């Protein structure tokens, strides 16, 4: 399935809209854009981490230049972000989880593999549903948004067919990879 927002090079977004794109429709490019921005802001706060990113000229919390970085530069920022994901996994005591990419797709350049267990996934969801913003986004049925110029418009629909608060199902996350197939 096409699980991309299909953002245009140079396009800029409100980050919250990308959270909807990620959580409602599993847009892989949204996960990467979020990862690049989160890594950039981490670098702004932590000068000691900047040795990997000589392509960044300004750490003034203005991430607009990220819409113009190349694939190799993106991979560096994504790697910084996945390190953060793995640190968070350790923080919430996920004993059998390791992340390679922010979108869950395999990385053809990396010989390591994502892995987790049903138990760790349950612990992850238990952690996430304590965040009101997360719950609000994941329970949204549909959302429309545009890039910051208003030129491009996007319609999102929640792909989770199991979501039904009347039956006690308040949250969940769908997904797909070639190796795993469709997942809930």
Predicted regions and their residues:
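Signal peptide-directed extracytoplasmic domains
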Residues: 1-24
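Penicillin-recognizing serine hydrolase domain
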Residues: 36-184
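A generic alpha-helix surface/boundary motif
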Residues: 28-29, 83
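Extracytoplasmic/periplasmic mature domains of Sec-exported, cell-envelope-associated bacterial proteins
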Residues: 1, 5, 26, 69, ...
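Glycine-rich phosphate-binding loop at the start of an alpha helix
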Residues: 16, 28, 115
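Short, conserved acidic/polar surface loops in the N-terminal third of protein domains
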Residues: 3-4, 31-35, 46
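Structural recognition of the beta-strand scaffold that forms the well-ordered cores
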Residues: 14, 20-23, 30-33, 96-101, ...
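Short flexible coil/turn linkers enriched for glycine and charged/polar residues
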Residues: 25-26, 178
